[in-house]
Amino acid sequence: MAQVSINSDYSEWGSSTDAGERARLLQSPCVDVVPKREGEASPGDPDSGTTSTLGAVFIVVNACLGAGLLNFPAAFSTAGGVAAGIALQMGMLVFIISGLVILAYCSQASNERTYQEVVWAVCGKLTGVLCEIAIAVYTFGTCIAFLIIIGDQQDKIIAVMAKEPDGASGSPWYTDRKFTISLTAFLFILPLSIPKEIGFQKYASSLSVVGTWYVTAIVIIKYIWPDKEMRPGDILTRPASWMAVFNAMPTICFGFQCHVSSVPVFNSMRQPQVKTWGGVVTAAMVIALAVYMGTGICGFLTFGAAVDPDVLRSYPSEDVAVAVARAFIILSVLTSYPILHFCGRAVVEGLWLRYKGTPVEEDVGRERRRRVLQTLVWFLLTLLLALFIPDIGKVISVIGGLAACFIFIFPGLCLIQAKLSEMEEVKPASWWALVSYGVLLVTLGAFIFGQTTANAVFVDLLA
């Protein structure tokens, strides 16, 4: 077996325990990962975790499914219909699963337990910094999307409570979207975002799962038994151009991006073996694919090209079953925002402390003041942007490109570097095949990131 010599300059900027909580960064809300100490079991040790194989499947599905679900019917419309949407997702699934397996392999090789630590250890300091910056921007953008989703659902719920028809004008000031989003954010999200720890993670995850499955069920049921007043728009059967297909990529990448939280899940397993993990992620992605396809196909066929970027906005306000779905989504987002903010704040904190060369063991008062300041700046910026961005589609079009980096580029770079580090005089055909596949991942990821980001900037944001 080839020996592997992974880059070791990760330690130049500090160990994985700096920035207060780096070892817990971006782990799945259902997984408790204990920072490594000398003498602890490595990721390959059978006694290194407590999560069963079935439990790991559930956690990965939980990490994958989320708010991006609401945008999938619009993604099918953008891609050019059901056939194009299905083909795009099926083609992407191979790369999504392989990226998850690559990360597990590199986690074993580097003995690291979180996504960014694996990238640091395998690819070096520069790539590690870029990875952490990407995580910070991605979580920031996702928080903006969460606030927009809250506004979308509140608009419909308030319309029912005020007994106003959809699209009515001249509403009272206290029903204005900007006011309701701001009030909800200050009353609920900000207090939950300031604490150093977020002990409600597991409850929030369970709520998110219930809400996601309920939304999927409602969309499918409403397609099978539609309301009489609902009339679909044009049902596209083919994409307008090949570029239109790629415009659906951000939603798919955003929806299936669970790679950042996958490494802690892998290391939490009782038997964290790459072969077992391959079965786990394959089963999890098939389940997620079924949920996303069910929502995307049925939502698109119900409304056609007229579907809203947030599919729940396309349904009448007075529909009780859909109103329950909206309430589920609001509760889920209210608890998910602090979790994403916690992850982004930890990245920013780590980068800042390493840049300043400040030890973690500083006085508690300075840490508390800095945490409150970081939280307020993060919260106010995301709120301000959410108030003036009209729909989640525009946000997902931007952060979906970053999701492609986590799915394609960083796993591809890790695979290339891991294989290049092997001490073998004669390289077998499998070695060249894996290196070539790594190059393919990086190239494809760079193309998706560049194309979707450019399209988001010049078409969506500047339109």
From Swiss-Prot:
Keywords: Amino-acid transport, Cell projection, Ion transport, Lysosome, Membrane, Phosphoprotein, Sodium, Sodium transport, Transmembrane, Transmembrane helix, Transport. The modification Phosphoserine is found at S28. One of its GO terms (cellular component) is neuronal cell body. InterPro entries: AA_transpt_TM. It holds the Pfam family Aa_trans. One of its GO terms (molecular function) is active monoatomic ion transmembrane transporter activity. The keyword Cell membrane does not apply. GO terms for biological process: amino acid transmembrane transport; asparagine transport; glutamine transport; sodium ion transport. Its main location: membrane. The keyword Transmembrane applies. The chain crosses the membrane at residues 56-76, 82-102, 130-150, 179-199, 206-226, 240-260, 283-303, 320-340, 372-392, 396-416, 429-449. It catalyses: L-asparagine(in) + Na(+)(in) = L-asparagine(out) + Na(+)(out); L-glutamine(in) + Na(+)(in) = L-glutamine(out) + Na(+)(out). It is found in: Lysosome membrane; Cell projection, Axon. It is a multi-pass membrane protein. Belongs to the amino acid/polyamine transporter 2 family. Symporter that selectively cotransports sodium ions and amino acids, such as L-glutamine and L-asparagine from the lysosome into the cytoplasm and may participates in mTORC1 activation. The transport activity requires an acidic lysosomal lumen. Interacts with the mTORC1 complex; this interaction mediates the recruitment of mTORC1 to the lysosome and its subsequent activation. This is Sodium-coupled neutral amino acid transporter 7. The gene is Slc38a7.
